[in-house]
């Protein structure tokens, strides 16, 4: 059997392989990514920044909140905006919120300004003779002994303004404001806190009625709001929006009960930093408010007692009518229903344990009672009737909380400071809404207990503000973003325009949940929504400020507002400075020459632009941002240097500039310098020639006329270096006149220059010719070497191909021959086996024959 080898066309394989290799190289080159700068991306990060307040304060009102807000806050925005951010999850933490700390400082400022101490009551830190108040003009059938003892009528001696004489005065004090002196005399008292601090009297005409205050973020920052209805105060929030200012928050200072706050939208919400830690307070936000009415029924009068030059002590002069105790009324039905709902929510948190409520366990009066300020008077109400498990067994429709009033109070904002609050004349009535509770849980080591006891708490006013600011956080807008693209900067033109003053803000944050590709398309529209004037986000607010400038005074808060404006401008200038350094001024999308390094992010191009948001991308490359910025700056510096070198070559780009009149002046100067130099050389050579002739015996001052003499053929003309020349006559042109002499010298100089330049050009041409021949010879030899190597490569390739073909042929032939022999042997064996019966039959036939 014969097998023929099949030859393949290796030349076609070489062509296809080269083509495929080229395509691979082109495709790999096309996947190169370059850093691109984007201005106006919806990216932010957590930040603490000074906020400014806004309120609808009435400048004509003497109420302290209005007075403070007029000086401290700007008018509210008539068109507040709230823009939902889709597909964004943001972490909030109400327990670590700088907005709470700022509000704490602001309300302390409000109280210190409202209750500014004017008069030291040191002259009253004396022994007071006090008795229970007896009303002689009115019946006391309805007055209990406790009510009588609640107010003391105290007499004391005071120094008059003139003559230093002593005068006896009297004033009414609440029982809580005086303490008995332990000397056995039951009528001797002194003012409380006299022995531990200096008591100061607040300025007169203090009136309290909290007004809503809005907190606003300055330009370059934003306030994010969590709108999840089941948000518990910490953790991720999926329903996020951005707002210019918070809702109006009434700064009500109270304990145990939260008054006039915001309500939960659906069920009652219970929040705590750690429910298993009994030292952490529990804030309850109600979904329905409960009205609480507080009354001081006594119609008090106020009297003024002079205690020094220009100083007066204001005290309660008399009580008209019955002496009845101050109290607060709460609807029993609503309170009972609210406690039932709170109990149900607490059972979910504490694994269906029995929930009980009890009164405060003890402590300062401000903690053990519901303390608050009612139009300038400080109420301390006993809430044991509210937090009582037997409340459902009582059928009265109203829960009455007995209250006490103090005029010498300890300031909640500072430790160890006491103040005398002036008495308020007339009846006092305060109507408020209970919108939340502050609870504490009893501790213990028995974790297997089936019962949890909760008591009213409070005292730290930060918890009051936290109950309103739990859904807000401040963030800093990062308007610059970098991302990889396939575009590379080719030519950088000098930009002379700039984008209007802008910082990424509010309006465009709605695109934060979009993919990077979708968000980058709308950058122009986003930037147009940024700022107008100083801050576009606050354009309406600024117009309101301009309309009411007469309301604003440059106080501490005025300076704070100016700082916010300066901060906005600084942030804008910083962004513009970076854009300018990178060569991106006036551009929203700016390509660079910096190649993208996969070590920064190994995600593919499509994965980045089609699946990721700008927020996710910023977190991905956060650790490399500054390094990328520095690389962009270095690349721009190198590009500017290259541009400078290129501009230096641009002077040769236009030959017509050579004929400019300003250039001709330079040409004339250069020509004069060259001619002067040549004349100087001519003079030097002339002097040297004269010296040479003098050495030969000629006289330079001779007046002889040179005549021509015919020499004999056998005589030499000269005896020195000129000797040996035959049949050559020398003559010297005789010229007369300055012009002729100048022309002769100039002609000789030009001829001399021409001859020298001609020689130089010939030498240069010869040199170039030799170099060209050498170069051509080298190139020819190199080309021949390359052709030789190529032919050698083709020869060995052909030999290898032939050897391979011969090898395949030999193997095929050998295999075929071997196969034929094997087949032949097998056939013989098969035929032999088939012939066995025949051979046996033939043998038997022979045997029989």
Swiss-Prot record:
Residues 381-403 are annotated as: V4. A motif (Di-leucine internalization motif) lies at residues 848-849. Disulfide bonds join 53-73, 118-203, 125-194, 130-154, 216-245, 226-237, 294-328, 374-430, 381-403, 584-590. Residues 692-849 are cytoplasmic. Residues 560-578 are annotated as: Immunosuppression. One of its GO terms (molecular function) is structural molecule activity. Residues 1-31 form the signal peptide. A lipid is attached at residue 750 (S-palmitoyl cysteine). Residues 709-729 are annotated as: Disordered. It holds the Pfam family GP41. Residues 130-153 are annotated as: V1. The keyword Glycoprotein applies. Keywords: AIDS, Apoptosis, Clathrin-mediated endocytosis of virus by host, Cleavage on pair of basic residues, Coiled coil, Disulfide bond, Fusion of virus membrane with host endosomal membrane, Fusion of virus membrane with host membrane, Glycoprotein, Host cell membrane, Host endosome, Host membrane, Host-virus interaction, Lipoprotein, Membrane, Palmitate, Signal, Transmembrane, Transmembrane helix, Viral attachment to host cell, Viral envelope protein, Viral immunoevasion, Viral penetration into host cytoplasm, Virion, Virus endocytosis by host, Virus entry into host cell. The record marks 497-498 as: Cleavage. The chain crosses the membrane at residues 671-691. One of its GO terms (biological process) is positive regulation of receptor clustering. Residues 360-370 are annotated as: CD4-binding loop. Glycans are attached at residues 87, 129, 137, 142, 153, 185, 195, 232, 239, 260, 274, 287, 299, 329, 341, 354, 358, 382, 390, 396, 433, 447, 597, 602, 611, 623. Residues 446-457, 448-457 are annotated as: V5. One of its GO terms (cellular component) is membrane. Belongs to the HIV-1 env protein family. This is Envelope glycoprotein gp160.
């Amino acid at each position: 059997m014969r097998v023929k080898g099949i030859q393949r066309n290796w030349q076609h394989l070489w062509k296809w392989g080269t083509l495929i290799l080229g395509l691979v190289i082109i495709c790999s080159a096309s996947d190169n990514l370059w850093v691109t700068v984007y201005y106006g991306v919806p990216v932010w990060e957590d930040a603490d920044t000074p906020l400014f307040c806004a309120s609808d304060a009435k400048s004509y009102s003497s109420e302290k909140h209005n007075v403070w807000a007029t000086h401290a806050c700007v008018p509210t925005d008539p068109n507040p905006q709230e823009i939902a951010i889709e597909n964004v999850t943001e972490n909030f933490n109400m327990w670590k919120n700088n907005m709470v700390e700022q509000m704490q400082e602001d309300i302390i400022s409000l109280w210190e300004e409202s209750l500014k101490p004017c008069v030291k009551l040191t002259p009253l830190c004396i022994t007071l003779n006090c008795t229970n108040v007896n009303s002689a003009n009115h019946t006391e059938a309805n007055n209990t002994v406790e009510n009588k003892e609640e107010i003391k009528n105290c007499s004391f001696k005071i120094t008059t303004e003139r003559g230093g004489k002593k005068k006896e005065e009297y004033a009414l004090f609440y029982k809580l404001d005086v303490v008995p002196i332990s000397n056995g005399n039951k009528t001797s008292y002194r003012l409380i806190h006299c022995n531990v601090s200096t008591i100061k009297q607040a300025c007169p005409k203090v009136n309290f009625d909290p007004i809503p205050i809005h907190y606003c973020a300055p330009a370059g920052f934003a306030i994010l709001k969590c709108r999840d209805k089941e948000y518990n105060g910490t953790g991720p929030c999926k329903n996020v929006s951005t707002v210019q200012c918070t809702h109006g928050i009434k700064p009500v200072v109270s304990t145990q009960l939260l008054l006039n706050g915001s309500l939960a939208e659906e069920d009652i919400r219970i929040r705590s930093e750690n429910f298993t830690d009994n030292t952490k307070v529990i804030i309850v936000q109600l979904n329905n408010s409960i009205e609480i009415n507080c009354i001081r029924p006594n119609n008090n009068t106020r009297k003024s007692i002079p205690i020094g030059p220009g100083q007066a002590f204001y005290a309660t002069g008399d009580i008209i009518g019955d002496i009845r105790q101050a109290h607060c009324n709460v609807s029993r039905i609503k309170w009972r229903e609210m406690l039932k709902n709170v109990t149900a929510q607490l059972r979910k948190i504490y694994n269906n344990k029995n929930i009980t409520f009890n009164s405060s366990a003890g402590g300062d009066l401000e903690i053990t009672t519901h303390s608050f300020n009612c139009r300038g008077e400080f109420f301390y109400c006993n809430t044991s009737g509210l937090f009582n498990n037997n409340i459902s067994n009582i059928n009265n429709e109203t829960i009455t909380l007995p209250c006490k009033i103090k005029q010498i109070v300890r300031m909640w904002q500072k430790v160890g400071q006491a103040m005398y609050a002036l008495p308020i004349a007339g009846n006092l009535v305060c109507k408020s809404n209970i919108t939340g509770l502050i609870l504490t849980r009893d501790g213990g080591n028995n974790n297997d207990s089936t019962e949890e006891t909760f008591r009213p708490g409070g005292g730290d006013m930060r918890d009051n503000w936290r109950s309103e600011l739990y859904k807000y956080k401040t963030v800093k807008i990062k308007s610059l973003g970098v991302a990889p693209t396939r575009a590379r900067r080719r030519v950088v033109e000098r930009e002379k325009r700039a984008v209007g003053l802008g910082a990424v803000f509010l309006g465009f944050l709605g695109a934060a949940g979009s993919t990077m590709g979708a968000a980058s398309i709308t950058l122009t529209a986003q930037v147009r929504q940024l700022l107008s004037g100083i801050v576009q986000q606050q354009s309406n607010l600024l117009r309101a400020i301009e309309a009411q400038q007469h309301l604003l005074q440059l106080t501490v808060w005025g300076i704070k507002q100016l700082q916010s404006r300066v901060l906005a401008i600084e942030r804008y200038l910083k962004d513009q400075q970076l854009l300018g350094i990178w060569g991106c001024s006036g551009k929203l999308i700016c390509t660079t020459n910096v190649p993208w390094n996969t070590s920064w992010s190994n995600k593919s191009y499509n994965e980045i632009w089609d699946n990721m948001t700008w927020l996710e991308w910023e977190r991905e490359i956060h650790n490399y941002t500054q390094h990328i910025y520095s690389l962009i700056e270095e690349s721009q510096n190198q590009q500017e240097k290259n541009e400078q070198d290129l501009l230096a070559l641009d002077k040769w780009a236009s030959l017509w500039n050579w004929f400019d009149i300003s250039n001709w002046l330079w040409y004339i100067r250069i020509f004069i310098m060259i001619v002067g130099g040549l004349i100087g050389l001519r003079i030097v050579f002339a002097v040297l020639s004269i010296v040479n002739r003098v050495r030969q015996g000629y006289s330079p001052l001779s007046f002889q006329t040179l005549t021509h003499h015919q020499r004999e053929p056998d005589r030499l003309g000269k005896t020195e270096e000129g000797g040996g020349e035959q049949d050559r006559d020398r003559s010297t042109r005789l010229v007369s006149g300055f012009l002729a002499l100048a022309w002769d010298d100039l002609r000789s100089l030009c001829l001399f220059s021409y001859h020298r330049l001609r020689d130089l050009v010939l030498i240069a041409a010869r040199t170039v010719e030799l170099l060209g021949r050498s170069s051509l010879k080298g190139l020819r030899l190199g080309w021949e070497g390359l052709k030789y190597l190529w032919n050698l490569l083709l020869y060995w390739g052909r030999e290898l191909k032939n050897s391979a073909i011969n090898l395949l042929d030999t193997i095929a032939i050998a295999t075929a021959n071997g196969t034929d022999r094997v087949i032949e042997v097998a056939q013989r064996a098969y035929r032999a086996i088939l012939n066995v019966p025949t051979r046996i039959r033939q043998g038997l036939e022979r045997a029989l024959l």
